[in-house]
């Protein structure tokens, strides 16, 4: 349908598996999934009962190219501007906590949107409030940090495990009960931070006070499902860094992701944009009317 009416192709092709993995562990419309900017929400729309209406995408009275609350209860937030998604997710998380709910809250934000100050303001808020929220960084361009082999993967699994987190909490509580224990806890934390600095690529987020996991393959559904399941169980702010490829599955879009980011109607075989139908723009109509009135 994107080839017929135009739209955001490369970004959506790059997040198909990611969206499917989130849907596998979330329950809609009870759970809340927010797409920062929102132009990568096509798969979400198809999976939430709008498949048959997809041919109306970006048409008058048809499906919007972005999430819309008045279009479906599964769209939690009307996005369109960048860097606002984490703030919205934090708001949903706090509202859930205050009302005694148990719904899952997640936000998908691109690496480009992390250039906006509002995103970091929200991350700082999440770290302070300690509310359960999963922030998925869809990294399809900027290298936030490279995986350090199998050891990094092993550390990710340990830090998401219940046994590790329960033991960590118990040891901290015991040590903080005495003056000597507090000194020991301080030394242990310093040692842990030094180790993480070397092995954990998202140390910046860890310094904020948010658990970081990744990078993981954004096209490996099983790995993402397992990671998301563990993350939601921990009930605290967690950043999951996934690496994706814009335009995944369509050769032209993979090779020219910027060109196919937002594209006019095109031929799927050749990848070339179709000649636009000649229509009069507002300026043309205005000029003709003024000439006619002056005659």
Question: Language-model segments: what does each one mean?
Answer:
Residues 1-7, 71-78, 210-214, 271-276, ...:
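Glycine- and acidic
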Residues 1-48, 204-228, 234-242:
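N-terminal amphipathic, basic-rich helices that act as targeting or association modules
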Residues 8-129, 282-295:
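Cofactor-binding active-site loop characterized by glycine-rich and histidine/acidic residues
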Residues 36, 108-109, 134-138, 241-245:
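Short beta-strand segments
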Residues 140-289:
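Long, well-ordered, tryptophan-enriched scaffold segments
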């Amino acid at each position: 349908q994107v080839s017929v009416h135009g739209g955001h192709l490369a970004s959506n092709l790059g997040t198909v598996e990611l969206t499917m993995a989130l849907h596998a562990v979330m329950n809609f419309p009870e759970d809340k999934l927010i797409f920062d900017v929102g132009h990568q929400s096509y798969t979400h729309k198809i999976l939430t009962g709008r498949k048959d209406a997809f041919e109306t995408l970006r048409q008058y009275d048809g499906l919007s190219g972005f999430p819309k609350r008045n279009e479906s209860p599964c769209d939690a937030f009307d996005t369109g501007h960048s860097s606002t998604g984490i703030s919205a997710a934090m708001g949903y998380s706090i509202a859930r906590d205050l009302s005694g709910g148990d719904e899952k809250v997640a936000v998908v934000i691109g690496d480009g949107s992390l250039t906006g100050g509002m995103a970091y303001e929200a991350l700082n808020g999440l770290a302070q409030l300690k509310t359960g929220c999963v922030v998925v960084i869809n990294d399809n361009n900027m290298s936030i940090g490279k995986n350090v082999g199998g050891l990094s993967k092993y550390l990710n699994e340990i830090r998401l495990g219940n046994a590790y987190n329960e033991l960590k909490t118990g040891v901290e509580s015991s040590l903080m009960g005495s003056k000597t224990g507090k000194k020991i806890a301080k030394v242990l934390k310093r040692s842990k931070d030094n180790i993480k600095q070397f092995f954990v690529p998202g140390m910046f987020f860890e310094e904020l006070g948010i658990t970081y996991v990744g990078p993981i393959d954004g096209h490996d559904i099983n790995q993402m499902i397992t990671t998301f399941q563990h993350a939601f169980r921990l009930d605290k702010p967690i950043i999951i860094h996934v690496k994706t490829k814009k335009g995944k599955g369509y050769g032209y879009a993979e090779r020219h992701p910027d060109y196919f980011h937002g594209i006019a109607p095109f031929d799927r075989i050749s990848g070339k944009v179709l000649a636009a139908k000649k229509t009069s723009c507002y300026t043309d109509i205005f000029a003709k009317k003024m000439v006619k009135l002056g005659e």
